[in-house]
């Protein structure tokens, strides 16, 4: 799986959340579920993938650009949110 991300957003994500966007590749490889992000019109289809890694839940938001998964953000999420997604 090929990924890409914006270097400025990577720096911001590390500063704000302590997680590099490259970690999204791990989340995508271990994802237990994905849902389309329909909260608003982003001008592109965005997916939210989530995975449990070392007892913690993470989310990776990405969009497909050709065959490349372009990572938009990566962050921790709580188990309550995961259960809500799995019940859909």
Give the positions of each predicted feature.
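Ribonuclease/tRNase effector modules and their secretory precursors
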Residues: 1-88
């Amino acid at each position: 799986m090929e990924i890409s991300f914006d270097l400025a957003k990577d720096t911001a994500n590390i500063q704000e959340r302590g997680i590099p966007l490259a970690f999204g590749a791990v989340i995508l490889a271990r994802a237990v579920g994905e849902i389309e992000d329909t909260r608003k019109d982003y001008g592109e289809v965005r997916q939210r993938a989530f995975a449990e890694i070392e007892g913690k839940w993470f989310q990776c938001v990405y969009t497909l650009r050709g065959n490349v998964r372009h990572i938009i953000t990566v962050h921790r999420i709580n188990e309550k949110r995961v259960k809500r997604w799995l019940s859909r």
